[in-house]
Structures are given as structure tokens and as C-alpha cells.
Amino acid sequence: MTKFVFVTGGVVSSLGKGIAAASLAAILESRGLKVTLLKLDPYINVDPGTMSPFQHGEVFVTEDGAETDLDLGHYERFVSAKMRKANNFTTGQIYESVIRKERRGEYLGKTVQVIPHITNEIQAFIERGAKASHDGKADVAIVEIGGTVGDIESLPFLEAARQMSLRLGRNQAAFVHLTLVPFIASAGELKTKPTQHSVQKLREIGVQPTALLCRADRPIPDDERAKISLFANMPQDAVISVWDVDTIYKIPQMLNEQGLDRIICEELRIDAPPADLSMWSRMVHTLENPQHEITIGMVGKYVDLTESYKSLIEALRHAGLHTSTRVNIEYIDSEELESGHTQVLESLDAILVPGGFGKRGTEGKIRAIQYAREKTVPYLGICLGMQLAVIEFARHVAGMQDANSTEFNLETEHPVVALITEWQDRDGRVEKRSADSDLGGTMRLGAQRVPVQTGTKASQIYGAEVNERHRHRYEVNNHYVPQLEKSGMIISARTPSENLPEMMELPGAMHPWFVGVQFHPEFTSTPRDGHPLFKAYVEAALAHRQRQAQRAVA
């Protein structure tokens, strides 16, 4: 029978509940347990697919095509289980499901209320999500409840968790509460009062934390932990200090050294061998002792909020791990390049244009791509980054000066990138779409297997086949592919049924390393295994840096 750990947050949001949950999961997995995770989001949106990155950060895409919270990316990077649609749900999905049942008459004429109908539905979703991994036989399911204690939006989720722990019985559920202990510079001390009030608020709704994770910018002294334990009505060893570190991959060791996994296993009556965190120790050692160093320029329009590119940033770090390289990322606002000032690109060892939507900043990205192509700087384009690479090549190499995407210019003479107008939905029905269709859930989503052309960089990186996740509405227009290929571009991977370009590259005679992919490889990169594409990209950046150094000496 699966046991549950509910992770809640207090005082403020963005304390790192997702990292804490993923780190605990990693420790429990290292003890030989099968672990899965769920994220419960209190917002009324059905999913984050149409939310602004400034509001929500990255949208993480699962293998089965769900647009989910970025915390699911942390989960997949920290544990071996693959997340699915059932591992993330929102208030919007809960209410949608309950209203559908009410319309079908499933409540037999009863008054539909938050308690019990909404809370029962939340519990049903939690139990369904816990069975999404490990063939439904997970030993532990860690359930992260979004928001903070005291938010009106989170109350039904907290109430559902309380009811569920009561229904499951003793030693079947535990609660971990993450809270803030701020340091007041003017007083020169840490203040525990916000944490005391947060735990008090949690206890008011019937939840007593099993363990308390206290976030601060420094380790919390024992006397402050003793004070917190007194007011929180819990043992002092269950008050765990979680201070700021330079890499999130130190967190599992930090929590293990303070006995969090022991406390949880004792509460849940789980008998498991000691944790083996040697892999995490090696990882941290490699991060702290790199043999090489490069700087990659990430050209985008959300560069002021790097959470928008969370999986991509981590994928580059993973590649650094597997090549003993410190990867520095310079975030470049694409709008600032539109005036033609490309001096900021001159010191870079490689250039990357990530995925995105909308016209704003695209001409600046195209200038960066042109610079990378003409100056033979290694280039990786992801999703929109590949589409813009095709547009840049069409304009400046293939002679189509007006080339563009219909996303940016419906009247373009050469629509080398165009809207996907027809595809199958998840039930196998063929759907027609237009620019006026709903935005939510109307993209090519999820993993897809694609054959790779032999003798290409793509085949050197991936072998015979690519299996990556997608999230896009627009595709390279097949009508223009012959003209692009005639000018030198190589389409190195195509979808088997529609024959749509999935990867493009330039031959070695034109550029040492210039690759674009329509999919999102960052979603499948992990610190354990890295990712072959990002590893090849970092190696290309190292080679470019070495060539530049040799030219400087000559």
C-alpha cells in the first residue's frame, strides 16, 4: 500500500517546496524505495499552458503530453520515475470534473459543496496520481501542495490532505512543512515568529507537521531550533535547517545529514536500508572542481525571469557535469539586438535560442543566429530557435528576403514556417485548427519517435532514432524544404507520417556545429545521465573556445 508525504509551505511562496520534495524523494529512492511525486496547484487555470512565463515560469511537458508545473521537471531530474498528466492537477481541473459529474447527475440531486465533493475529488485525483508511476506500486507518494498556508485557494487541498491522512490511518501519512526564517540585518538576528505563526495556522486546520524545514540564508543555530520546536509542538531534531547553497544538488545531502529521511521512515513505519548518496556526492564534487569553462549566450525575451528556462538551464549544467565544464550562461535580451549592436555576442563560446511564442524580440534573435552562422560560433536552436534559424537561412542564404513565419506575418511572401492546420488529438480524432482556435491544449504535445538520417550530426548524437517531447503550434513549411536543401541546409530528422522537419543542421563545409531541433530536449535531461545533444553542444563550445585561443596566440 502506498504511503503519503504531504509537503506544504508557509509565510511566503517560492521557498523551494519543489526542490525540498524532490530531494526527499531522491533520498528515499537511494534507500531502495519506489517513490513518485505529485504537484497540486491551487489556481483555477486548467493547466499552465496559456499562462505567461512572467506569471508562472516554465511549462514542463511530460512524456504523455501534459503541460504541467515546472516542479515536475525537478521531480524527473531528482528521481527515476517519469511524471505523467496525473502527477499534476489544478483547482480548475477539480472543479471541471465535479461540474461534469453534477451535470451527469452522479450526485443524485444533492447540493454540491466544497466539503465533501471538492475534497473527495481532490483525494481521488491524489490516489490516481500516486498510481501513475511504478506500475501503480509506489512505496511512497510525495504530494506537494502549492501556495502557502493561509491562502484561501489552498484550503480545500489542505483539508483534503487532512481528511486523507485520517482515513488512511496511523503511520500511513506524514506532513513536511517548509517555512521562512528571515534574517533581519538591522537587528542582526534570525526571526522565528513568522514560522511560529505559520505552524499555528497549519495546526488550526488540523494538521500537525511531522518535520519542519526552516529556510534561511544561513544555518539556524540550535537555540533558535529549540525555540521553534517548543512553539511548533514537535521534537527539536524534526526542526531542520535548510540554508542557501550554490547548487540545488547539495540539498539531498543536507536533508539526509539532519535525518529527515529517518524521521519520515519512522513516522511511516518503513524499514529501509541507509541512504546511499554517493552519486550526489560525486556530482557536487564535479560541479565544484571543473576542468574547463565556457560561456553560452542564451538569447530570449524572458531573460529577466530565468525560471522561464529552468529545464534548459539545468540541462546545460548537466552537460557541464558530464564534460567536467563550468557552464556560464549570459542572458541576452533579444530586443536589445534588434538595433544591430552585436558586440555582446563577441565574447561567447556558443549561442542558444530557446523556445518561445510571439513576435516580440524575434528579429533580435534572427540577428544573433546570423552572427552565429557567419562567425562560425556553435549554435543550438530549440523549437522557435530552430524555426528562426530556418527563417534566417532562407533570407540570407536561400535568397528569400521576405521569409518569415505566419505567426509573425500572415502576409509574408515566403511562409517558411506555418501553423499546424491538422493533426490528431489524444483520442485519435483528426482536428482542424486555425489562427482563431483556442490556445489551450492545441499544440503538438508529448513524446514522439522520429527516425534520423544517417551520416549527419544528428545521427552522431542520437543514433538511428530520436524520442523527444514537443510543445509547438508551428512547423517548418515542407513546400520550402527543397529550396532550403538546395542552398545547403540538411534536414536530418523528419516525422515518419507527416514528413515534417524535426531537426536541421548545416554541413561541416558551411559551419562546424549549427543544429536546430523542433522538440524540447531539455525536458529529458537529468544530472544522472545528462543528454547527448547538450553534451555535444558543450563539446562544440569547448572546441570553438580552443580554436579562438589558438588564433589569438597565432
Swiss-Prot record:
Residues engaged in binding CTP: 13, 151-153, 191-196, 227
Catalytic activity from the UniProt record: UTP + L-glutamine + ATP + H2O = CTP + L-glutamate + ADP + phosphate + 2 H(+); L-glutamine + H2O = L-glutamate + NH4(+); UTP + NH4(+) + ATP = CTP + ADP + phosphate + 2 H(+)
GO MF: ATP binding; CTP synthase activity; glutaminase activity; identical protein binding; metal ion binding
Annotated positions binding UTP: 13, 191-196, 227
Entries under Pfam families matching the protein: CTP_synth_N, GATase
The protein's enzyme class: ligase
Note: CTPSs have evolved a hybrid strategy for distinguishing between UTP and CTP. The overlapping regions of the product feedback inhibitory and substrate sites recognize a common feature in both compounds, the triphosphate moiety. To differentiate isosteric substrate and product pyrimidine rings, an additional pocket far from the expected kinase/ligase catalytic site, specifically recognizes the cytosine and ribose portions of the product inhibitor.
PANTHER family in UniProt: CTP SYNTHASE (PTHR11550), CTP SYNTHASE-RELATED (PTHR11550:SF0)
Subunit annotation: Homotetramer.
Role summary: Catalyzes the ATP-dependent amination of UTP to CTP with either L-glutamine or ammonia as the source of nitrogen. Regulates intracellular CTP levels through interactions with the four ribonucleotide triphosphates.
Descriptive protein name: CTP synthase
Organism: Ralstonia nicotianae (strain ATCC BAA-1114 / GMI1000) (Ralstonia solanacearum)
Gene name, Swiss-Prot/TrEMBL: pyrG
